[in-house]
């Protein structure tokens, strides 16, 4: 969208939604000019210093309206024309910043977003676009291997691309620097370190839980937090648990952690795990094609964290080396390849759980369900398990066949059809099916 058209649209939205007094809109907004610096940075040129002061009171309204139009967060600054031109001249005199990221850099572009992490991703983008505003500090928590470090690195990289000065440290690096300064026995060393950290516009600290019970480090840390928040500079922290569950920190530190925004990265859901597997396969350059149901199988059974996914793809690459380029990796291949790998049981809804619940109901074994015996109880248990694999897990008939002793897809379709007919004809059987389904999905 052209800048002029964007500005007109924003003004019309502001008038319509009445979040700002109409007199202010006419006096200070309509008479202003929108300048696009980049896709994530805009400056609004205001006629007077008074106008700048007034519009700054509505900065969050502008950020919200830009988000509603552009579908992404942007930074917005209000300046007079004189100040803007003065700043532009200063910027032109600066040495150019090297903004070229390495191919393997962790960025927002290569962070796979799904329902398990979309809140954290949105919050991370927001603090880059609007540092030091509402979400300060930003506290991202979740188990190891879910992408916290990737998001923190993405914040660092994007903020630096935007020309911000950023310090990123692990808690181990942070502690080591403080201890080294303290060991020198000179207070000036501590002050120098404090000054160095405070000179940044972003301070990003990974794995703050490891600062637990480090009193001297935490005293220093608390002073840093105060300086950044008081000066409108952005803090970003990560941890394996929420602030409330952190042990070994005094109450004032927990209060500080909670004073901005705490947002989780949850366990990977199957669709997100599938996207990450596909992205990693593309990145690693697997030569052979791989069928979608094979990828889904991996996502459902082995992809409880990102690091494990990289290991899975490495095994696929090695498998590919051993086979012709024309070989298409299918479900049977991956089932055989990972048969000795413990299942992560992602989301706890899987074929194994279905078989366990149904086997218990019909008093048969899982081995019997997978086998060839055709007594009434075993046949009903087998067919019902296949039916649930279809309606609950949305598995393909080929995939179901592979998971039930290597049966072909026509056998699976026949079994599912038989169960559907029984549900339609027999009310008691329908009740049994509903009861088992609720038990499987945890209702």
From Swiss-Prot:
One of its GO terms (cellular component) is cytoplasm. It is found in: Cytoplasm. Residues 100-320 are annotated as: Domain III, AAA+ region. This is Chromosomal replication initiator protein DnaA. One of its GO terms (molecular function) is lipid binding. Transmembrane segments: none annotated. Domain I is involved in oligomerization and binding regulators, domain II is flexibile and of varying length in different bacteria, domain III forms the AAA+ region, while domain IV binds dsDNA. Residues 76-99 are annotated as: Domain II. It comes from Mesoplasma florum (strain ATCC 33453 / NBRC 100688 / NCTC 11704 / L1). Residues 321-443 are annotated as: Domain IV, binds dsDNA. It holds the Pfam family Bac_DnaA. The lineage of its organism: Bacteria, Bacillati, Mycoplasmatota, Mollicutes, Entomoplasmatales. Residues 1-76 are annotated as: Domain I, interacts with DnaA modulators. Keywords: ATP-binding, Cytoplasm, DNA replication, DNA-binding, Lipid-binding, Nucleotide-binding. PANTHER family: CHROMOSOMAL REPLICATION INITIATOR PROTEIN DNAA. Oligomerizes as a right-handed, spiral filament on DNA at oriC.
């Amino acid at each position: 969208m052209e800048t002029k058209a964007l500005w007109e649209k924003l003004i019309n939205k502001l008038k319509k939604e009445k979040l700002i007094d109409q007199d202010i809109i006419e006096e200070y907004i309509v008479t202003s000019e929108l300048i696009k610096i980049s896709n994530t940075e805009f400056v609004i040129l205001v006629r007077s210093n008074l106008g700048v002061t007034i519009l700054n009171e509505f900065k969050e309204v502008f950020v919200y309206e830009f988000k509603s139009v552009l579908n992404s967060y942007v930074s917005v600054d209000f300046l007079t024309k004189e100040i803007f031109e003065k700043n532009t001249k200063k910027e032109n005199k600066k040495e150019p910043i090297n903004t070229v990221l390495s191919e393997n850099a962790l960025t927002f572009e290569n962070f796979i977003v799904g329902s398990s992490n979309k809140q954290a991703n949105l919050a991370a983008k927001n603090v880059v676009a609007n540092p030091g505003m509402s979400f300060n500090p930003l506290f991202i928590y979740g188990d190891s291997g879910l992408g916290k470090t990737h998001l923190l690195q993405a914040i660092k990289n994007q903020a630096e691309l935007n020309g911000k000065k950023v310090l990123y440290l692990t808690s181990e690096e942070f502690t080591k620097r403080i201890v080294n300064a303290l060991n020198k026995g000179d207070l000036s060393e501590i002050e120098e370190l404090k000054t160095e950290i405070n000179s940044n516009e972003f301070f990003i600290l990974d794995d703050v839980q490891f600062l637990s019970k480090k009193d001297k480090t935490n005293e220093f840390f608390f002073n840093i937090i105060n300086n950044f928040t008081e000066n409108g500079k952005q803090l970003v922290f990560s941890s394996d648990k929420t602030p409330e569950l952190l042990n070994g920190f005094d109450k004032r530190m927990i209060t500080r952690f909670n004073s901005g925004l705490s947002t989780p990265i949850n366990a990977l859901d199957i669709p997100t795990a599938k996207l990450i597997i596909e992205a990693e396969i593309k990145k690693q350059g697997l030569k052979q094609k791989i069928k979608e149901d094979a990828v889904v199988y991996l996502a459902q059974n082995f992809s409880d964290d990102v690091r494990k996914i990289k290991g899975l793809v490495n095994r696929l690459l090695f498998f590919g080396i051993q086979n012709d380029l024309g070989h298409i990796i299918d479900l049977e291949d991956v089932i055989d390849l990972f048969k000795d790998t413990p299942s992560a049981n992602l989301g706890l809804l899987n074929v194994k759980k279905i078989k366990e619940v149904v086997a218990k109901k019909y008093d048969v074994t899982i081995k019997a369900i997978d086998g060839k015996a055709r007594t009434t109880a075993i046949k009903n248990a087998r067919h019902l398990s296949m039916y649930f694999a279809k309606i609950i897990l949305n598995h393909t008939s080929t995939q179901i066949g592979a998971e039930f002793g290597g049966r072909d897809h026509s056998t699976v379709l026949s079994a599912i059809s038989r169960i559907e007919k029984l549900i339609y004809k027999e009310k008691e059987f329908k009740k049994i099916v509903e009861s088992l389904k609720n038990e499987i999905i945890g209702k």
